[in-house]
Amino acid sequence: MKVHFIAIGGSAMHNLAIALKIKGFEVTGSDDEIFDPAKGRLAKYGILPDDIGWHPEKITPDLDAVILGMHAREDNPELLKAKELGLRIYSYPEYLYEQSKDKIRVVVGGSHGKTTITSMIIHVLQHQHIDCDYMVGAQLEGFEVMVRLSDTAKVMVIEGDEYLTSPIDRRPKFHVYHPTIGIISGIAWDHINVFPTFENYVEQFEIFAKMIPADGQLIYCQEDEELRKLGERISNTTRKPYGVHPYYIQDGITYLKDGEKSYPLQIFGKHNLMNINAARLACNALGLTDEQFYEAIVSFKGASKRLELVAKSSECAVYKDFAHSPSKLKATINAVREQYPDRKLVACMELHTFSSLTEEFLQQYAHAMDEADVAMVYYSPAAVQHKKLPAIHPEMIFKAFEREDLQVFNDSEKLQKALLETDWHKSVLLLMSSGNFDGINLNQFGEKIVFSRA
């Protein structure tokens, strides 16, 4: 099989390209920009494009498939050439479905927790030596790539994003996967540039749930009021609601309770205890017992940038997290607050996504950082301009978060200076962003904060 990727540098795209290369396909690709880690990983597998940019001459009649990334535009010269030649053009969700249509597909949807739940299921299946294919949105410890496609696995576990499939396909990605077992972790309005109303956003999850066959399962979080109402409207498949798994915290370690037994975890937070229940029900649906699930989950360390410990001493700990939406922000701060009740909690987040930099959506952040002792918000005026959005002013952020002592920064150097000058005695720093605060190496910065005081 000969496959070409248009926009090979994307997170999901380059992982799919590597997965197909591992499978023995002949893989080529193009992009107008490729950064690390994608650049280094593509080079390692011998599929990094020789030249940056679009090259229509790479689109030849002998290609079996052209896979189109979201980064490419409708007028992309390679896409136009592929159409002209009548080649089979797939988005990466379409191609994943094509490769898994004869398998049991576990699709994890929801506004938050998708990556973690997907990672948990994959971890448990691997631990129990159950062959599975997968696509997950973050790097996992012990896994070389975020996508695996094989001819042997009977199950595929897919992180199902609700964002658009491709520039020429306006369907949400998770609709394309046709779930056998569908999980919805929660509904909190996002991607307002695509789903202009909350009702329109919720509708996408209902469509997803109604795609599940009669012999499948819908696993959904009943702690979420909107999801509870949605669940009551679903009659086409078996419904499995879940909530927070019973637990207790002792000496800074969270334990799962199962009758008389308890299991120590390497992760924490009520949101993760809900994620665990979702993963447990999915594994049950695939034939695993609770005991097999618990035996495996105790060694799960979490996905990259999901409450990931950067550095720690007896005095101070630094975590980084992907949290950026209001619901994720609140859940992540609350998790750290519960885990470290006697420490000063400094929460620092970046407004980075299209939605979060929109004045209308900003109002959703009211009281999201109330559980932190110190709250800081960073945004980049250049990012606002790049996204062609109206200018954001610090006063708008103060008003939106409804916190009088909120500290707002729009200069990365000043933010770093403020954090480095903070007294970190008996404290925890939580850095939250889907970006990197305009070029901060979060690992190095976290270590600097912890070990400069050691």
Regions found by a protein language model. Give the residues of each.
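ATP-dependent carboxylate-amine ligase
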Residues: 1-34, 42-49, 62-66, 82-87, ...
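Fold-independent oxyanion-binding glycine-rich loops
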Residues: 8-9, 30-31, 69-71, 92-93, ...
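Short N-terminal binding/cap micro-motifs at the start of the first secondary-structure element
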Residues: 12-15, 36-37, 142-143, 274
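Phosphate-binding loop of NTP-binding sites
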Residues: 19-23, 57-61, 70, 74-220, ...
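Short, charged/polar "capping" segments at the starts of alpha-helices
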Residues: 34-39, 57-58, 73-76, 142-143, ...
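Beta-strand->loop->alpha-helix junctions that form or flank phosphate-binding loops
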Residues: 51-54, 90-97, 135-138, 234-251, ...
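Short polybasic amphipathic segments
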Residues: 253-258
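Short pre-catalytic strand/loop immediately N-terminal to key active-site residues, enriched for Gly-Thr
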Residues: 263-268, 316-320
